[in-house]
Curated annotation (Swiss-Prot):
GO biological process, one term: translation
A GO molecular-function annotation: structural constituent of ribosome
One GO cellular component term: cytosolic large ribosomal subunit
Posttranslational mods: One or more lysine residues are methylated.
Keyword entries, A-Z: Methylation, Ribonucleoprotein, Ribosomal protein, RNA-binding, rRNA-binding
Similarity-based family: Belongs to the universal ribosomal protein uL11 family.
Gene from which the chain derives: rplK
Native source species: Bacillus anthracis
Quaternary structure annotation from Swiss-Prot or TrEMBL: Part of the ribosomal stalk of the 50S ribosomal subunit. Interacts with L10 and the large rRNA to form the base of the stalk. L10 forms an elongated spine to which L12 dimers bind in a sequential fashion forming a multimeric L10(L12)X complex.
Protein name, entry field: Large ribosomal subunit protein uL11
Biological role stated in the UniProt entry: Forms part of the ribosomal stalk which helps the ribosome interact with GTP-bound translation factors.
Length: 141
């Protein structure tokens, strides 16, 4: 028989840097999960993606065991990395902070494809372009 799910926890944690301190500790401690076990497993699984923020969905079962699924990094994080900026513009419609080539947008869209609700890479590109626009990043051909 399948184990009964008692809690779903969604977190965004820097790759390879999960530790028992907040936000990880309190979120998992309430569910009675072995926090160090999760941290070690998460860090091992995301060691190759250092520097990126990784969304993770943790499913906690009745017997306090857990499974987790790592998602692709948020489009905003990938855009900031490609553009080489620290943060987006406070006034995206007035001041633009960077420009990104369309082929880089395609790369990001292809990376995000498994997690996006898009039928094609072109649709995913439009989503990523919208994120870029809201951050004050100009897309050029």
């Amino acid at each position: 028989m399948a184990k009964k799910v008692i809690k779903m926890v969604k977190l965004q944690i820097p790759a390879g840097k999960a530790n028992p301190a907040p936000p990880v500790g309190p979120a998992l401690g309430q569910a009675g999960v072995n926090i160090m076990g999760f941290c070690k497993e998460f860090n091992a699984r995301t060691a190759d993606q250092a520097g990126l923020i990784i969304p993770v969905e943790i499913t906690v079962f009745e017997d306090r065991s857990f499974t987790f699924i790592t998602k692709t990094p948020p489009a905003a994080v990938l855009l900031k990395k490609v553009a080489g900026i620290e943060s987006g513009s406070g006034e995206p419609n007035r001041n633009k902070v960077a420009t990104v080539k369309r082929d880089k947008v395609r790369e990001i869209a292809e990376t995000k494809m498994p997690d996006l609700n898009a039928a094609s890479v072109e649709a995913a590109m439009r989503m990523v372009e919208g994120t870029a626009r809201s951050m004050g990043i100009v897309i050029e051909d």
